[in-house]
UniProtKB/Swiss-Prot annotation:
ANK repeats lie at residues 42-76, 85-118, 153-186, 190-224, 227-256, 260-288, 292-322, 326-360, 365-397, 401-434, 438-470, 475-514, 518-550, 554-587. Keywords: ANK repeat, Repeat. PANTHER family: ANKYRIN REPEAT AND PROTEIN KINASE DOMAIN-CONTAINING PROTEIN, ANKYRIN REPEAT-CONTAINING PROTEIN-RELATED. This is Putative ankyrin repeat protein L91. It comes from Acanthamoeba polyphaga mimivirus. PROSITE patterns: ANK_REP_REGION (PS50297), ANK_REPEAT (PS50088).
Length: 642
């Protein structure tokens, strides 16, 4: 926001405040504004006259007349009375000069003994500010944040004047206050002096004149605020070079550090390369490290600084692969940013061109590529991944869990960016048949953790030669088993999506009659679950010619397993479904067990409930003459033949 816009906005807000608050009769218990956003009660009459000076006829003359009253002449200390917020008349005049009152009023107060060193005691607060005023209040926001607030140290008239340097009157106010003996190094709640406050607001044209005034009056350039920031640290972050030069010329320490050990040089990287070069010329230590053992190159990389600064620092810091205590090289540090900034792409490019190692790993043997594929996926990530791969990043590197970048990308499928990342990894020939330390194939992971975008990725992997019949775990399940299980294990229960995955696997050669560890096929797994069966997936598998009479290692069929695992009521509908699709009710397993032997107890104790089952079997070529159980054979035959 330029000066013209600021003045225009102040004019609008002046009208708002005067109309809303200030043009009303004086009342000691009334509420009035000390400045644009701070209100208080218990205003003195002098304060009231000051805030209304420019909005009333002969406003300044009214102030002169008031100060000449006998009560004020006999009691000169009355001029320093404070309102409920701890503000004096001089404070109010200093911060509103040029807007609500005149520079002559500030001078008049000082001539009548106003004390420029009184500090407000309640602390400046920003609560209750109207939203339409926020862009104006930002002029003084930095000086009002209350950190480690101490009621003994508040803002003085000088620090308030330095908080708003948008007009020429602000400079005159500072000059007057200094002339009348204000303490140039008085500190506020945040440990900030007038010099520090001015450097925070130094984007305004008049700031350099005020800084020069403060320095001429021996302002302490080495003082640190509560965060350990000196005026120079604040200045190098955003001020123009001429202000930085002025501070250094007047004794500022170019190697000062804040509470986190960050140096002036580190903070300067966020500004411009000219300031970085100037500080180094003046003796700034380039090899300094902060409390986290991070050097200036690390710090600059972390803060998305411009590429010209990175390039310059690389020329000064010869080893871009230097490791800090967290074993993060500069390259890894940049690539592991949560949200990749456009400047990060330029930084990565520069680092790689200057011999940075794209295969550096952390304590878990994770590469930069793995980390980006896991947590830091956005459009800029694609550019960074391709740069790493072009510069020799090992696409098939594994971590301590035996996982590759492709494993991690497939674990994090949540948007279209992931699909693009996987395509990029495939372009650089990542191994689609890699198996991790647990024996899990990527295709297995995708099928057992099926999500919205999984189908596209599975198709990509199959197109690039992924083994569709790979097995995993003690059960020796193939991807088809896991795809089928999704209907039962997924909270979404989406049969249509599961069907699409099953069809895709079968299209690329999945064996529909594959068996697990004990010889069970998928149909057996489905029919023996304590869940809804038959279901759309089971029916679909039968359409795909799964063997309904397949026998497992024990010789059991799906029909035999149904009666081994389920109650009679539950078994009937499943048995009917299997028989309708060609299941043979006469098969005997390796233990010489058949349907009658399995239903042995039910024949004796639930005979009436068994009858419907055997009638069902008879409809599907059941041969009762081959069975005989403890003398019940003839009774059963007679019943069934009735």
């Amino acid at each position: 926001m330029d000066l013209g816009e600021i003045e225009k906005d102040f004019t609008k807000i002046d009208e708002y405040f005067f109309d809303a608050c200030n043009i009303k009769s004086y009342n000691y218990n009334g509420t009035y504004y000390c400045c644009k956003n701070i209100s208080s009660t218990h205003f003195t009459k002098l304060m009231y006259l000051i805030i209304n000076e420019k909005n009333s006829t002969n406003g300044h003359q009214k102030i002169i007349k008031y100060l000449k009253k006998k009560i004020n002449v006999k009691n000169p200390s009355r001029i320093n009375r404070q309102n409920d917020e701890g503000w004096t008349a001089l404070m109010i005049a200093s911060i509103t000069c040029g807007q609500w009152c005149s520079i002559e009023t500030v001078r008049l107060l000082l001539e009548h003994g106003a004390n420029p060193n009184i500090q407000e005691k309640n602390g400046l607060q920003l609560s209750g500010i109207k939203s339409q005023l926020a862009h104006i209040i930002s002029l003084i926001c930095k000086t009002m944040r209350q950190k480690n607030s101490n009621p003994e140290n508040g803002f003085t008239a000088l620090s308030l004047a330095c908080a708003v340097l948008d007009t020429g009157e602000s400079v005159e106010v500072v000059e007057l206050l200094l002339k009348y003996g204000t303490n140039v190094d008085s500190i506020n709640h945040n440990g900030e002096t007038a010099l520090i406050i001015t450097c925070q607001n130094s984007k305004y044209f008049h700031s350099i004149f005020v800084i020069d005034l403060l320095l001429q009056n021996n302002a302490n350039t080495l003082h640190k605020d509560n965060n350990g920031f000196t005026a120079l640290i604040h200045a190098v972050s955003h001020c123009p070079l001429n202000i930085v030069k002025l501070l250094v010329k007047n004794g500022s320490d170019v190697n000062a550090t804040d509470n986190e050990g960050k140096s002036v040089l580190m903070h300067s990287t966020k500004n411009s390369i000219d300031i970085v070069k100037y500080l180094l010329k003046k003796g700034a230590e380039i090899n300094h490290k902060n409390n986290n053992d991070i050097n200036v190159l690390f710090f600059a990389s972390k803060n998305h600084v411009k590429s010209d600064v990175i390039m310059f620092l690389l020329a000064k810091c010869s080893n871009p692969n230097e490791i800090n205590t967290n074993k993060n090289a500069v390259l890894a540090h940049v690539c592991r940013q949560f949200n990749h900034h456009k400047n990060d792409i330029d930084t990565v490019k520069i680092l790689l061109e200057n011999r940075a190692n794209p295969n550096i790993i952390d304590d878990d043997s994770r590469t930069i590529l793995m980390d980006i594929c896991t947590d830091y996926q956005n459009e800029n990530s694609l550019d960074i991944i391709e740069m790493l791969l072009k510069k020799g990043a090992n696409v098939n590197a594994t971590d301590i869990e035996g996982r590759t970048a492709l494993n991690y990308a497939c674990m994090s499928i949540n948007n279209k960016i992931t699909i693009k990342i996987i395509k990029l990894l495939l372009k650089y020939n990542i191994n689609v048949n890699h198996v991790d330390n647990d024996g899990a194939h990527i295709l297995i992971d995708l099928c057992r953790n099926y999500s919205r975008y999984s189908l596209k990725v599975v198709k990509l992997l199959l197109e690039h030669g992924a083994d569709v019949n790979i097995t995993f775990g003690n059960k020796k399940w193939t991807p088809l088993f896991f795809a089928n299980e999704n209907l039962f294990s997924s909270s979404e229960k989406d049969p249509e999506r599961c069907t699409k995955l099953i069809d895709l696997l079968i299209h690329y050669g999945a064996n529909v009659n594959a068996v697990g560890k004990y010889g069970n096929n998928i149909l057996m797994e489905d029919t023996t679950r304590n869940l809804e069966c038959p279901n759309s997936i089971t029916k679909h598998l039968l359409e795909k010619k799964i063997n309904v009479n397949h026998q497992n290692d024990n010789g059991d069929t799906s029909l035999l397993l149904v009666y081994e695992r389920h109650e009679l009521e539950r078994a009937y509908s499943i048995a009917q479904f299997l028989l309708e699709h060609g299941c043979n009710p006469n098969i005997i397993n390796k233990n010489e067990h058949n349907i009658l032997t399995i239903l042995n107890n039910d024949i004796f104790w639930n005979f009436e409930k068994v009858i419907p089952h055997f009638k069902l079997f008879l409809n599907y070529n059941f041969n009762p003459n081959i069975y005989q159980i403890y003398g019940c054979h003839f009774i059963l035959i007679n019943v069934l033949l009735i």
